[in-house]
Amino acid sequence: MRGLSIALAALGLGLATPLLAEPSPSVQVQVEAALAEAPKGTRFGLLVVDEAGKVIASVNPDQRFIPASNTKMFTTAAAYALLPGMDQPDVAGGTQVALRPGGNKHVPDVVLVGRGDARMSSASDCKVDCLTTLADAVAAKTKVVRDVIGDDTAFPDERWSPGMSWNNIQTEDGTAAGALNLDDNQLKVAVVPGVVGKTPTVTVPAYYTVNNEARTVAASSTPTLALERAAGSNRLRVYGEIPADSKDWHQWIGIDDPALYTAWTFKGLLQARGVKVIGQPRSANRSRDPLIDRACDTCGVGFAISGTPEPFASLTPPPLAEDVVIIDKVSQNMHAQVLFHRVGAHIGTGSTDWSVKGLQQVFAKAGIPREGYDFSDGSGMSTYNRVSPRAVVALLRWIDAQPWGKSWYASLPIAGVDGTLKHRFIGTPLAGNLVAKTGTLNATNALSGTFRAASGKRLTFAFFANDVPDGQTALPTMEAVLLGIAASN
């Protein structure tokens, strides 16, 4: 494959230990041969080094690639580096509840104050970080409230990643993220077939209304059922065909205003506890203001919102380190985006700009070349993100030297064992061995992490495939390359 760049000894990783020597010609030949079998037009980037920094394999290591969910590695590493008490209960992020005096016969509004927790749950079997705990607290204090307000103002109102494809907004992968979140900001839509020729039964929480255009068709027919929801709309269109013998069909959909959904859910919980709600659920948001962003250059650590009523009850979520495991193992986009804004809120206003500044501060200290990355979000859903293989390897080697490095590496999927790598590399020497973050986006595959080669050497790698032709995948090629490198070293 033409255009393969072989790293020279003079090129470093931005770390104290430089890259040493050229990759072995035999290994490089193997890599070239494997990449030649990839879908035509695919652009690859690869860098593999050993523990001493010696380059094992190198393909376009300084070119920049869309990283997809490899972005999450940068987000979670920055969180570990900047946010205090990652291994302690997340007192700073827990949702609070307050009563705000109202003008209607002095009936107060109830306000849920979000502070950047991505894990709060309304599930009936919830044990920790439960919205019902706050509902119980309100019911013990008053029997009537006016409006139920979801206060999302701890972060600016930037619910989606700049550069995210609009068609992802209705999906669970592209659901909105904010300071106040509930149930992963997604809802389940279930469809059960009916009598042939009739509409099936669609079940979804009443937060959404349904336009059911679907039809039940003869058993053994090909299902064509689909969902559609316009951005900003709470109306679902269900259409297509479901066979009469189909098992229950379900799909998760995103939520555009998580704070409003949380307030809507909280209203129901209050009513179930005998609290009369005479008003409506609504959300309170804070528009992003570039002037405030610039003014915060001198605001110190963090950014305080004025006018928030004094809370009388709070939740304490589990440690953020546990959420890092969720983010990296299963590649949870919304959680990653919330953590990204937590980084920005720690040093500034919580805006995307401040969150990016937080990442840049950390990576400058790590010696990661600035030209090696650009980020527009924390999850990897943005197509504006760019990283080089060299920048990723630099990040991974720097993390190795941090006191929290082992905890961070434990959050990554293990090949053939768990997370997004559970069904990959099975039956190969890399099963149970390779530990890495995956990444998948339109025309993009990514995989970066570490593995033990046949010799026992621990190798660190970053591997990207961009511009993969539609309907094809680069994964078999990438896996073949890594297996070959493992066997040859």
Residue ranges and their predicted role:
Residues 35-59, 282:
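A short, well-structured edge-of-sheet supersecondary motif
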Residues 22-25, 29-34, 81-370, 454, ...:
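Conserved serine DD-peptidase/penicillin-binding transpeptidase domain
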Residues 1-7:
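Bacterial N-terminal signal peptides that target proteins for export
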Residues 58-78, 82:
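Short active-site loop at a secondary-structure junction
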Residues 56-59, 330-333, 337-489:
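Small-residue-rich helix-loop
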Residues 46-48, 93-98, 448:
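Short beta-strand scaffold segments in enzyme catalytic cores
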Residues 16-18:
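N-terminal signal peptide c-region/cleavage motif recognized by signal peptidases
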